Regions:
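Flexible loop/turn segments at secondary-structure boundaries
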Residues: 22-24, 209, 242
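Short glycine/acidic-rich loop motifs that flank beta-strands on beta-rich extracellular proteins
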Residues: 22-26, 45-48, 94-102, 121-128, ...
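Right-handed parallel beta-helix
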Residues: 38-40, 81-92, 109-120, 133-147, ...
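Surface-exposed intrinsically disordered loops and tails
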Residues: 67-72, 167-174, 208
């Protein structure tokens, strides 16, 4: 595939023209790759095929494809670096209410995601930011997710800030080391969140062998709108050196 050629070449640029693209499996993005989505691009997650093969865990994974075949191959921030996913105009990632994620950003660094509209989440997250450093998510829209309950199919954060920890089940990628790497310098700006449980947050925490808490740090949540969320706009758990600035919170906490 194109991104695998780019990995072997040391990087590159992939431009998707206007149209609907149906994903059954993950597209992997290696280092030094920019994916540009032109106006009118729709990425759909699908389930039903003649082969009835289950969909992948995520539509996009920020990881070199050759590493996904190896068990616990990547840890710390040593995965994909210097990668961008940029929308030019109206671009939609539609999960079609299939359980899974839109984007997995695990053990990576220097990542930018911009201008994308997400919809159709079911029981997971739109973006999993996990053990990552220097991630910018800007001018995105996160729309309605399928409702659940705390007992069943509870829809958590649109953007989950987490760490790989086998005790908490923080990440399900077999290629990721469960090394409790925290997130550092994560910026979520100028985005809109509406119609789900939470906007941005963490719902589990990890500790060292000596039972000391491990903290995500340098989190910036700025200039966003959180509207009609069942639970909370921002759910902080074990964050430090965090700034939450100039956001709008409208009719949140109504219950899932």
């Amino acid at each position: 595939e194109y991104t695998e050629r780019m990995r072997k070449a040391g990087g590159g640029k992939l431009t998707l023209k206007k149209g609907t693209y149906r994903f059954q499996y993950s597209v992997c993005i290696p280092s030094n790759v920019t994916v540009v989505f032109e106006d009118g691009v729709v990425i759909e997650n699908i389930f039903d095929t003649k082969a009835h093969i289950k969909p992948a865990t995520a539509m996009w994974q920020l990881v070199p494809k050759n590493m996904t075949y190896k068990n616990k191959a990547i840890g710390k921030y040593n995965g994909t670096s210097n990668a961008k996913m940029i929308a030019k105009g109206k671009v939609v990632f539609d999960m079609n209410y299939i359980k899974g994620l839109s984007i997995i950003a695990v053990h990576c660094k220097n990542i930018e995601i911009s201008g994308i509209t997400f919809k159709g989440m079911n029981g997971n997250h739109y973006i999993e930011v996990n053990g990552a450093k220097n991630v910018k998510i800007n001018k995105c829209k996160f729309n309605k997710a399928k409702k659940g309950s705390p007992q069943k199919a509870y829809v958590k954060e649109a953007i989950n800030i987490d760490m790989a920890d086998e005790i908490t089940g923080g990440v399900g990628c077999t290629w990721a080391k469960q090394d409790k790497t925290p997130c550092v310098n994560i910026k979520v700006t100028n985005s809109v969140f509406q119609g789900m449980s939470r906007g941005v947050g963490t719902h589990n925490y990890s500790q060292t062998k000596k039972k000391k808490n491990i903290y995500h740090s340098k989190i910036l949540i700025k200039g966003n709108t959180f509207k009609n969320l069942y639970d909370a706009g921002v759910y902080l758990m074990n964050w430090k050196n965090t700034k939450i600035l100039n956001n709008r919170f409208i009719k949140n906490g109504k219950g899932n």
